[in-house]
Amino acid sequence: QTITASVGVTYDENQLDTLINGLECMQADQQVEPVNAHPEYDGNSYVVKAGETGSKIDTENFKKVVKESIEGFKSEIDMTAEDCYVEPKYTIESEEVKKACDDMNKYLKASITYNFGSNTEVVDKDLISQWVTVDDNMAVTFNSDAVVKYVQQLESKYDTYQTKRTFTTGGGNSATVEGGDYGWIIDEAAEIAALEANIRNGETVTREANYSQTAASHDGADWGNTYVEV
């Protein structure tokens, strides 16, 4: 006849929970939050940056493992092997992260070169990468406000409407005039729409800005080489 006996372990669960909660590894200042894998710009494109497990304890599972170890007379716990740490939501294998990278890289295909006379301004991946973001749920967003600010910077730099102009009079003296209705004016609304469309469509183009009013030249005096002194 075979007799099977089980060895039981009894303990006060409340006291055990108190002991577990008092462990150094359970203290908030000893725990580091896990970091999700995420898209990261490497200077050429967005690639998947590996996340980190950190040291944040999965409290429920940790207590379960401790109790099982006591009941099994185990003196040590491999916390990594026993999945006692909170894992990142996204890893390098997560399809959501891969898709986010692909979506962000679509914007980086664009390259827009503006001609302003002998000057050029370029909107390419290095700049566009600053206008594309991804949130904690791997949703990609293009920052349209950044396009608005960029076009406004172009206006500040290249618009000449109602600016002061200095020229040499017929008598050889220097004179300055201001006001009037002459000069370059970038059509802000049209240019914002055009630039954003270029970027969203991943286009490579060389072009002039959209203007609501033009002048003779971007280089030097915007009236060119001819004027009438009144």
Which sequence ranges carry the predicted segments?
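Surface-exposed, secretory/extracytoplasmic low-complexity segments enriched in Ser/Thr/Asn/Gly/Pro
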Residues: 1-230
